[in-house]
């Protein structure tokens, strides 16, 4: 097995974790009430990722681009890594909520020349119906519901491509609030160097727990939480952004319950906690386990 210091791609990182600590919880998803909705270990995640990679290879998607349209949850991170193992370039973006959002997604599909959309089976028909109405929507786009089992046409596993560190791992898109969404290419090497720096600074390790409600298509959510947790071999507890927006205290309750050492958010999130959490509720919280709470992605207000 390759040594940790010799890892040069994100897929190698997951393989390492699955071999070294297969029974360690990798990710846990909480529902709106703060109860566990689902969880996955590194070993189970690796198995599911390989299945998705085979599905993508069987669809002929190697070396092609794919849009990832997922709600918050473990299904996203499994699909994301399925792309990496299959040599498919993933572009995670937000679920469309309006005609304006549909137009942005159409622009991203055009800009990336995407060949496929990865999504949940329950969302496929709705997305087909709404997105296909967009001008210049590609008629040959492949829809891949990654949570649905499909019998492979070939019983033999297709060989996984060899990925090198200089290859582009994924695309991150700007919000497109003031102009067309712009894609940023993130290489495996660039991402791993960033993760190494963050983990070294935070001193996170395989005993660490992260808590995040941040969108998985944003850098702070994807890299600083989902991938940093994987890099350190820790456990990442997830909440939906909508859960935090309606009940900010659930973020702090998760930190309290799981004795999390690491979390982060933009300044507005901390201010929302200050404004919305009542003194009586504060008595139920214990944030003494925190080693690092990142405040980033927007201007910091010292008064917060």
Model-derived regions: residue spans:
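AMP-dependent adenylate-forming
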Residues: 14-40, 168-171, 178
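Conserved AMP-binding/adenylate-forming core of the ANL superfamily
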Residues: 27-64, 68-77, 81, 98-106, ...
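Structural core segment of the AMP-binding/adenylate-forming
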Residues: 85-153, 267, 272
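Conserved adenylate-forming
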Residues: 131-145, 241-304
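Conserved AMP-binding/adenylation subdomain of ANL enzymes
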Residues: 192-209, 219-261, 276-280
């Amino acid at each position: 097995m390759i040594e940790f210091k010799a890892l040069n791609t994100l897929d190698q990182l997951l393989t390492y974790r699955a071999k070294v600590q297969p029974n360690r919880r990798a990710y846990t998803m909480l529902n709106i009430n703060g109860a566990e909705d689902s969880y996955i270990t590194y070993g189970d995640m690796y198995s599911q990722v390989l299945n998705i990679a085979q599905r993508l290879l069987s669809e002929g998607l190697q070396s092609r681009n794919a849009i990832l349209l997922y709600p918050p949850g473990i299904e996203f991170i499994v699909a994301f890594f399925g792309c990496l193992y299959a040599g498919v370039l993933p572009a995670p973006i937000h679920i469309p909520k309006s005609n304006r959002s549909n137009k942005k997604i159409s622009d991203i599909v055009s800009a990336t020349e995407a060949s496929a959309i990865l999504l949940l089976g329950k969302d496929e028909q709705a997305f087909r119906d709404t997105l296909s109405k967009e001008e210049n929507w590609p008629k040959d786009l492949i829809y891949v519901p990654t949570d649905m089992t499909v019998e492979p046409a070939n019983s033999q596993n297709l060989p996984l491509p060899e990925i090198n560190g200089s290859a582009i791992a994924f695309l991150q898109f700007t919000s497109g609030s003031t102009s067309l969404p712009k894609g940023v290419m993130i290489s495996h090497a660039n991402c791993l160097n960033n993760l190494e720096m963050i983990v070294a600074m935070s001193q996170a390790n395989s005993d660490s727990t992260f808590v995040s409600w941040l969108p998985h298509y944003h850098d702070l959510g994807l890299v600083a939480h989902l991938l940093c947790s994987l890099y350190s071999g820790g456990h990442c507890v997830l909440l939906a952004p909508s859960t935090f927006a309606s009940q900010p205290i659930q973020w702090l309750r998760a930190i309290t319950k799981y004795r999390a050492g690491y979390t982060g958010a933009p300044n507005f999130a901390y201010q929302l906690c200050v404004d919305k959490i009542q003194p009586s509720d504060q008595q139920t919280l214990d944030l003494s386990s925190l080693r690092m709470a990142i405040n980033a992605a927007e201007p910091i207000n010292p008064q917060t």
